[in-house]
């Protein structure tokens, strides 16, 4: 299975990418999903796709996400987290 990092998973291209991953879940797994502020959509995606890590680049949105998220993925906040998360072995 190919592990995929979807940066901007809540945007137009990102949601289309998530659709492809959904259709081909035997081939792909969204191991990392990332968004700037769309934490409600990100929480929905996390519940469906069970990523290993979630990145929210906006600091305030990240704090709010931590209040509403009850999953077990690593949650990283801030722009620098994007460059760190793509270096993971599970991507």
Predicted regions and their residues:
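N-terminal Rossmann-like dinucleotide-binding module
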Residues: 1-54
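A structured beta-alpha segment of the ubiquitous adenosine-cofactor-binding alpha/beta core
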Residues: 66-91
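A conserved hydrophobic position in a structured secondary element of the catalytic/binding core
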Residues: 8, 57, 77
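Short, ordered loop/turn segments at secondary-structure junctions
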Residues: 11, 38, 59-60, 80
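Short, charged/polar "capping" segments at the starts of alpha-helices
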Residues: 40-42, 60-65
